[in-house]
């Protein structure tokens, strides 16, 4: 009896574990967002070389978040992180219209890979405080509608302050 009760208890009250990749072009704000999620504060960051790994608890999940560098020379390495990924957070600098088509191209490469076909996609339109593009503008530029079978949602966020991140992560946790 004790084992059954323990099993039921852990099923409903223990946290599920999930691997999440945080990807996007360099200078999109991935590491700033990661530390805002982890610590609830803005830390001064430097460009990521390789990856940053953090464990974050959100809702009923223990998330293993891999923030992978977005520089041109390092993007081909992204695919080596895909295995067992349950969620993808793709961060876009909404103030950088010049690189929006490049961001779209990289996102479509990711979404075209079978290893992440079942992963939920959280598209973060970062730097909303600069008021250049709306989250819907970013979503349209990323042509997310081409992936109709993909669980995805776009949120406008401000990585420096954390604005919008709780709602975005709630959606991700509910859809993984």
What does each model-identified segment do?
Residues 1-176:
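TRAFAC-class small GTPase G-domain
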């Amino acid at each position: 009896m004790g084992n059954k009760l323990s099993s039921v208890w852990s099923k409903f009250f223990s946290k599920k574990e999930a691997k999440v990749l945080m990807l996007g072009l360099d200078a999109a704000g991935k590491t700033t967002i990661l530390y805002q999620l982890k610590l609830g504060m803005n830390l001064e960051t430097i460009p990521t070389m390789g990856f940053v790994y953090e464990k974050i608890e959100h809702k009923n999940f223990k998330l293993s978040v891999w923030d992978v560098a977005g520089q041109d020379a390092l993007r081909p390495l992204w695919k080596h992180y895909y295995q067992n990924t349950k969620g993808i957070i793709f961060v876009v600098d909404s103030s950088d219209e010049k690189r929006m088509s490049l961001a779209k191209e990289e996102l479509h490469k990711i979404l075209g890979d079978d290893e992440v076909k079942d992963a939920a996609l959280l598209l973060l339109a970062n730097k909303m405080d600069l008021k250049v593009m709306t989250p819907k503008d970013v979503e349209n530029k990323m042509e997310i509608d081409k992936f109709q079978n993909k669980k995805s949602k776009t949120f406008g966020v401000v990585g420096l302050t954390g604005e919008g991140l709780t709602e975005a992560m709630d959606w991700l946790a509910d859809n993984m």
